[in-house]
């Protein structure tokens, strides 16, 4: 889908996740891999034991500042991304002075595995045929309209889980200087970057197309409910 992909592996204890999944990836010469070891991650988060284990604001900024495209997307590895033609349509039809967040749709490994069991041909060559899975998910899914306010009166948390796909021009990302790097704990940082866009007099809008999918992983991940991350950012500070 993308002209350039930058993968930031943050704080993996032994080795980058990339080495476990690279056999399922078609590399096209546009992939950059940056590893932040546990030792460096600790230094960058002021040796704070309560910092988010996968510190999103720092990891995202490392990628954003090295990206070279006209439009930059901040996203996660548990997302099945839009089709290229749909993403190009988004860019062509929308305002270059607006910061966008695209609402994710839902899938899980049970649905994915059932699809490949039914379509054995695709299972045998997953990395070359995964697009068929995405087309299937698009056909059986609907737009996810799920609004959310982080705190009362908050006009910036315009959809739930807004950080799974945020897109804006490079000029907007540079003007707002990316994510706020004091927000090293979990929650609210994705809403905060949208607030920063508005404060810099850019537009802010939620979209429900193009279709993209979050692969459910239960309580594991970068959130607050899984027991890994013990502290949340202050929503009023954010």
Regions found by a protein language model. Name each.
Residues 2-13, 32-38:
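Short beta-strand/loop segment that forms part of the nucleotide-sugar
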Residues 154-155, 159-162, 182-238:
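C-terminal catalytic/acceptor-binding lobe
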Residues 13-20, 109-110:
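Short, charged/polar "capping" segments at the starts of alpha-helices
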Residues 64, 82-181:
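Conserved catalytic core of nucleotide-sugar-dependent glycosyltransferases
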Residues 17-66:
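Active-site-proximal specificity loops/subdomain of glycosyltransferases
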Residues 69-82:
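Short beta-strand-to-loop acidic/aromatic patch adjacent to the donor-nucleotide binding site
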Residues 56-61, 79, 84, 161-165, ...:
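Conserved glycosyltransferase catalytic-site signature
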Residues 36, 100-105, 209, 213-215:
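Short glycine/serine/threonine-enriched helix-capping/active-site loop
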